[in-house]
Amino acid sequence: MNTPANGSLSRRSVLRGTAGAAGLFTAGGLLTACGGIKESSAQTDAVLRIGYVSPSTGPAAGFGEPNAFLMKKLRATFKDGLKIGGKKYSVEIIDRDSQSNPQTAAQVAADLINSEKIDLMLVTSTPETVNPVADACEAAKIPCLSTAVPWEAWYFGRGATPEKPFTYTYHFFIGVAELHAAYTSLWTKGGVETNRRVGVMWPNDPDGKAIRQGLGPQLTKSGFTIVDPGAYEDGTNDYSAQIAAFKKADAEIFNTFPLPPDFATFWKQARQQGYRPRIASIAKTGLLPSQIEALGPLGYGLSAGFWWSPEFPFTSTLTDQTARQLADDYEKSTGKQWNQVIGSNMALFEVAVHALKATSDPKDRGELAAALGKAKLTTVAGPLDFTSGPVKNVSTEPLVMGQWRKATGGSTFAVEPVIVDNGAFGDIPRGGELEPLR
């Protein structure tokens, strides 16, 4: 077993992964060449320019599926502008595709900061996109809010410590504590008996490093035996060694945090080579219907954490839609099945508007960044509180466990997730019981 005994995280113990991209934004670098850094925007004061970066293409493209729907809805929401401090501002959202690539993410961040002169950056989905954009904003003193990355991978992965937090970059999402609580609740109370041996595939990337250092020790303390063949590289094509280790240990629970194409390769090889756990709880993939559909019948029975679903009993502060209404709106407008990124990305803009309205001058970068750090509100994704997070700059959010099943009851879609464990969040209703994979 390669999981360390110490569950604490430090800036040294988590792979920075995307740190090289931040070099574009150091003093004397690109920003200086483009005219330096100013504490307020050079754009017309009556216009608030919001940059939005997400992976719309590349390995993490599934996370960008809701973008067109959200951009249309949000631009309509902001068509009359925002009134802040007695002054009316028009709002422009400038969206960019990171292509699921850290270097591209850094480049589009540079363009938004230096050419578009944005006042606020919003960025979402995976460390490969979020971390380089956040690094760029911290260096340029641009307020930035992000989501859909485990907070430890965002915080420690970018070099922060409780003694030296960030000034301009803020984040909300789940972390190791939420994952640990959700997984152990499902694995012990879900009704599927196991030998409590967990085969893990945690990659050599920011997510994998944070999970190995944080989640592994906590699972061990909770009485699970971790079967860890070691970190693997993203893009690996042959998982025979890992599969052999899991079979030898009879790991009846499986957990992984891979890129979607990597999991598809592994899961097919696992079935071919005779590894079939009783429970498989996955993250970073298996979160979206398209990712499950791509697996065909092999996707049935996989479980995953859900940070948003139509069952969440919350309402958007921007559109006044309940979670169910927002999901139905998406399906009617696009013909596609809802996915949980809709909730987190809508909440991203909800927090942004809350912070903008809390300032006397939304173009004062320092004031806007401070307002993000004081934000406390209930969004369509649930309650967020940046004043009492696990560390400065961070708020966590609810997480429940769902299981993917073949759609029934005349559904127009191929698969459907069922909430099978709500843990500490009793106000989020369960829809069924966990079913074993074998």
What are these regions, as identified by a protein language model?
Residues M1-S13, G20-G29:
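N-terminal secretory signal peptides
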Residues I37-Q43, G62-F69, G81-G159, F172, ...:
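Beta-alpha junction/loop-to-helix N-cap segments that form part of ligand/metal-binding clefts
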Residues L48-L74, R96-Q103, S125-T126, M201-A210, ...:
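Extracytoplasmic "Venus flytrap"
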Residues I118-D228, I279-A304:
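Extracytoplasmic ligand/sensor domains, especially the bilobed periplasmic-binding protein
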